């Protein structure tokens, strides 16, 4: 029987994205560059009207841990809930830019 330890447990990082293209790369890079690597990074594009959605897609092409969900704007809580529905991690972390 295998038990998850704190060093092997999957962590889901949910990042709602709405019109933050200027800060998005810094935010995502800070998560990617963490020493803990057993992560899934869920970028929820909440109907951005800037280039945020495209930036999210570019990140998903270079890192298989990154998943992107594009949705109609519903606000921060809705974006978080959509991310929660997708998340598979034992632990959940919400990150804002």
Each PLM stretch: what is its role?
Residues 12, 37-40, 64-67:
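Structural signature of beta-strand start/N-cap positions in the alpha/beta core
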Residues 30, 45-54:
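A conserved acidic beta->alpha catalytic loop
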Residues 71-87:
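Glycine-rich, basic loop-to-helix element that forms the pyrophosphate-binding segment
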Residues 92:
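Short aromatic/hydrophobic "clamp" motif used to bind/position activated sugar donors
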């Amino acid at each position: 029987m295998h038990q998850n330890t704190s060093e092997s447990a999957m962590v889901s990082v949910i990042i709602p994205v709405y019109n933050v293209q200027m800060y998005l790369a810094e935010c995502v890079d800070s998560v990617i560059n963490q020493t803990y690597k057993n992560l899934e990074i869920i970028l929820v594009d909440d109907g951005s009207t800037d280039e945020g959605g495209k930036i999210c897609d570019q990140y998903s092409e270079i890192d298989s841990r990154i998943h992107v969900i594009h949705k109609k704007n519903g606000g921060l809580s809705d974006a978080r809930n959509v991310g929660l529905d997708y998340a598979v991690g034992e632990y959940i972390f919400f990150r804002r830019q």
